[in-house]
Amino acid sequence: MLSSAELIETTADRLSAYHAGHIVADPVLAASSGKKLIRDDAIDYLKNRLFPIAELITPNIPEAQLLSGISVRSKKDRIRCAQWLYETYGCAVLCKGGHDKETADDLLYADGAYRWFPGKRIEQPNTHGTGCTLSSAIAANLAKGFDLPSSIERAKDYTTHAIAFGLNLGAGSGPLHHAFDLNSRFAANARQEHNNITLN
């Protein structure tokens, strides 16, 4: 998480120096609790240094409104907001819908066009780190060679399951269960090994 202008500038410099590809920037401006996570002067550095070298930025609705100055009250507003961000910063924009009360649909604006990615809303208190998980999963899939739409689809599927299997750790909002699929694969492998032993 880049909370200061100095951190953002250093990160942007290093990414440019190493010619990094598939940069996904999640502008973490505030926590779901409302707590501010970035200094005011750092927002300009996000806009001017990090966004222009990113392949994709992934603001949620409140962040998209803050970055664009456009009020989002409908899907049409969200399209207009994402288009403004795309045209202003020259990168693809995934406007996340987790803060929408009715749906969890995400909006991608890229290459001059938009596309909706339907999402399933899950009633789960343990959602700490959802946005970071989604953006990291998108970056991982881009690094594997998947195109942007496929990377988003795969990342949304992974994140949805990680939310569904969220970990209940003490009080407050717990984290997602990032290893949910790893555990299931281990279980499947163990069953297969057991069956092989039984058959032999």
Residue ranges with predicted function:
Residues 65-66, 124-148:
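Short, small-residue alpha-helix embedded
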Residues 1-49, 59:
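Glycine/small-residue-rich loop that forms an oxyanion/phosphate-binding "nest" at active or ligand-binding sites
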Residues 149-200:
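Charged C-terminal helix
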